[in-house]
Amino acid sequence: MIIDTTEVQAINSFSRSESLKEVYGLVWLLVPIFTPVLGITIGVLVIVWLEREISAGIQQRIGPEYAGPLGILQALADGTKLLFKEDLLPSRGDIRLFSIGPSIAVISILLSYSVIPFGYRLVLADLSIGVFLWIAISSIAPIGLLMSGYGSNNKYSFSGGLRAAAQSISYEIPLTPCVLSISLLSNSSSTVDIVEAQSKYGFGGWNLWRQPIGFIVFLISSLAECERLPFDLPEAEEELVAGYQTEYSGIKSGLFYVASYLNLLVSSLFVTVLYLGGWNLSIPYIFIPELFGINKTGGVFGTTIGIFITLAKAYLFLFIPITTRWTLPRMRMDQLLNLGWKFLLPISLGNLLLTTSSQLLSL
């Protein structure tokens, strides 16, 4: 059977179009996955640069200045160096637990970003239990730290892992009533609904003014969850060498630092969402979208404004934990546990009781 040349060309063009469709489908499948990862990575690099510059200013010294303009690429250079360092394994440790621990710590924190709204309808998963899903996911990270400490077969590492687990439990409990109080005020546990509830009265509608006690407790608890000074007892250098990180080197050691800064950024973003109005500017800016002919809550321009406002609030809030790290001394372990169980927990429960009573009286 003789096939015409035109038919052959048509078949070839059809096969090419089908292969192109498969390639496009694969690209569009990977874009939603790698775009948030790329954004989070850039956010962590910015935090590292900010911390180095702020700490240099506090200590009256010069920060990083050689790697890129103003030293902004120094964190990228350090990460690249860690990639090529030797990955040492403890000879008498549990290799499986030792290797899995850092991954659990990083992945559990990355999952928290799925419920954070960066703009109007710009959230990976708008769940009705968004804030409580974050609390549940964040409680998985200490398991990875405990596995790392136990798998290292080192007394300093194991003590650091135990401290991390005890500290996380002690400050997760007072943090939960603060989040529950916000949910009662907003009549929802969805992060998007909580931001929308704060947009009704502009700047005065922020939960920061309606829940000042809860905000302070949430701030202290989130700093303890991030293991930042004065709450960095799981990795206290003078006592435990480096805590659960003592036996780690190379990329696995870098994963712990990434997890620390990821957790810090997550806490700042949740402070922005729960207490600082989220993506809402809280200042009338209707003339800006009208000037460009774009709706305030829709379109590329409105989405970009929402992302910028959310990140600006989060990074401005980051000055508090960065400054406290370089100004306050470390607490003792008994002081840390007493602060969580005997001070913050009763205050957070009392704040929840007051919030519940006010909501019942307003019905």
UniProtKB/Swiss-Prot annotation:
Keywords: Chloroplast, Membrane, NAD, NADP, Plastid, Plastoquinone, Quinone, Thylakoid, Translocase, Transmembrane, Transmembrane helix. NDH is composed of at least 16 different subunits, 5 of which are encoded in the nucleus. GO terms for molecular function: NADH dehydrogenase activity; oxidoreductase activity, acting on NAD(P)H, quinone or similar compound as acceptor; quinone binding. It is a multi-pass membrane protein. InterPro entries: NADH_UbQ_OxRdtase_su1/FPO, NADH_UbQ_OxRdtase_su1_CS. NDH shuttles electrons from NAD(P)H:plastoquinone, via FMN and iron-sulfur (Fe-S) centers, to quinones in the photosynthetic chain and possibly in a chloroplast respiratory chain. The immediate electron acceptor for the enzyme in this species is believed to be plastoquinone. Couples the redox reaction to proton translocation, and thus conserves the redox energy in a proton gradient. Disulfide bonds: none annotated. It catalyses: a plastoquinone + NADH + (n+1) H(+)(in) = a plastoquinol + NAD(+) + n H(+)(out); a plastoquinone + NADPH + (n+1) H(+)(in) = a plastoquinol + NADP(+) + n H(+)(out). Its main location: plastid. Its EC number is 7.1.1.-. It comes from the Eukaryota. One of its GO terms (biological process) is aerobic respiration. This is NAD(P)H-quinone oxidoreductase subunit 1, chloroplastic. Coiled coil: none annotated. It is an enzyme of class 7 (translocase). GO terms for cellular component: chloroplast thylakoid membrane. It is found in: Plastid, Chloroplast thylakoid membrane. The chain crosses the membrane at residues 27-47, 98-118, 127-147, 255-277, 300-320, 336-356. The keyword Plastid applies. Belongs to the complex I subunit 1 family.
